[in-house]
Design a protein with these regions (language model features):
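An N-terminal hydrophobic leader/cap segment in hydrolases
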Residues: 2-51
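Alpha/beta-hydrolase superfamily serine-hydrolase fold, recognizing
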Residues: 9, 13, 20, 45-356
């Protein structure tokens, strides 16, 4: 993806981000407090220090649990079955949004699996913290949860990731960064009994080699139906994709937009098979500029299943809906398309978590 003009200053982008965040938070409030059935709120919030990123700071983790199964340190005398964990990344173009925006998805998971724990990551946002900070915060959160697994009775072998839009990109790319980090001696204390059980991803970006115009061209109905104006897409890209921090082609100063950390759909087969769990589900939207690249990646992973290299690939196209359709306040009308997508995704988790 080439820049045709210098991006705006970081201060200008930060001012825009502040305004956009206020608007999105209002929409989220309408969904969380005025749309039925009401989703749950987080039961616990914990701040952890960033260790993976070179940019110091803290990362907020929001824990969602069923009322009957609160999050609390396990007593030595307790012998309860370890709990499966879903680690979620919210959307918002890496620049806006909040971990609470996915409360409805968390509630759907907990209704089906009351013993589960959903952890929504409030990763640090661009333009203040552009690529690769959100990606590194995701790896940091997983590493911390693995380290604390015994204390909170988490099942280290049943960690699944989920995310929508930009969060979907993170859910698909974080395993690569996590794999790189785990090669370092500093994480030896985590132990060997760790692995990701699955990925559940909603309308992700998977191929940053395509410009926004090129993405629209792959699905011409998308710009007609989208409620996201081109100016907002440009803001997202300018905020997150700060050229100085982007991957470069080896031995050059040219930005490599095909790098797996940006474009997980283009990752080499060897990396995918070394880092991905055996089960992945990708859901795409029929009226979305990201439809084709998401479908292409799902089909590519499906080829690994046919070759016996992965266990299962799920997900489908949700027809006649726009990007982010499940986050719109529904008030008393409900959202049948969202319910169908979330319902299927919950069934995918049953397979990933090996729940009878």
């Amino acid at each position: 993806m080439a820049y045709t003009s210098p991006p705006p200053s970081r201060s200008v982008l930060s001012n825009k981000a502040h305004r956009y965040r206020i608007l999105l938070s209002l929409r989220s409030l309408l969904d969380r407090y005025l749309s039925w059935p009401l989703p749950p709120g987080p039961s616990v919030e914990i701040a952890i220090p960033s260790k993976v990123s070179k940019t110091p700071g803290s990362i907020q983790l929001y824990f969602f649990t069923a009322p009957s199964r609160p999050l609390c340190p396990r007593k030595q005398t307790q012998r309860l079955p370890p709990r499966p964990v879903l680690i979620n990344f919210h959307g918002g173009g890496f620049s806006i949004g909040h971990a609470r925006d996915d409360s409805r998805w968390a509630g759907t998971v907990l209704k089906a699996y009351p013993d589960a724990v959903v952890v929504s990551i409030n990763y640090r946002l661009a333009p203040e913290r552009p690529f690769p900070v959100p990606l590194e915060d995701g790896a940091d959160a997983i590493l911390w949860l693995w380290q604390e697994a015994q204390k909170y009775n988490f099942d280290k072998t049943r960690f699944a990731l989920s995310g929508a839009s930009a969060g979907g990109n993170l859910a698909l790319a974080v395993p690569f960064r996590l794999h790189e980090e785990l090669q370092k001696q500093r994480w030896a204390s985590i132990g060997e009994e760790i692995e990701l059980a699955g990925l559940v991803v909603f309308y992700p970006s998977t191929d940053w080699t395509r410009s926004r115009i090129e993405r629209d061209a792959t699905n011409p109905i998308a710009p007609q139906k989208s409620i996201i104006p081109p100016s907002l897409f440009k803001f997202f890209d300018d905020s997150y994709l700060l050229p100085a921090g982007l991957p470069k082609w080896p031995g050059t100063d040219r930005v490599d937009m095909s790098h797996p950390y940006l474009s997980p759909g283009l990752a080499p087969e060897s990396l995918l098979l070394a880092t991905y769990p055996p089960a992945v589900a990708i859901y795409t939207c029929g009226w979305d500029q990201l439809l084709v690249e998401g479908n292409t990646f799902r089909e590519r992973l499906g080829g690994f299943v046919e070759e016996g290299k992965m266990a299962s690939i799920g997900g489908f196209v949700v027809e006649d809906v726009i990007h982010g359709f499940d986050k719109k306040p529904s008030f008393c009308r409900g959202n049948k398309a969202r319910d169908r997508m979330y319902g299927d995704a919950v069934n995918q988790l049953k397979v990933m978590w090996k729940i009878d």
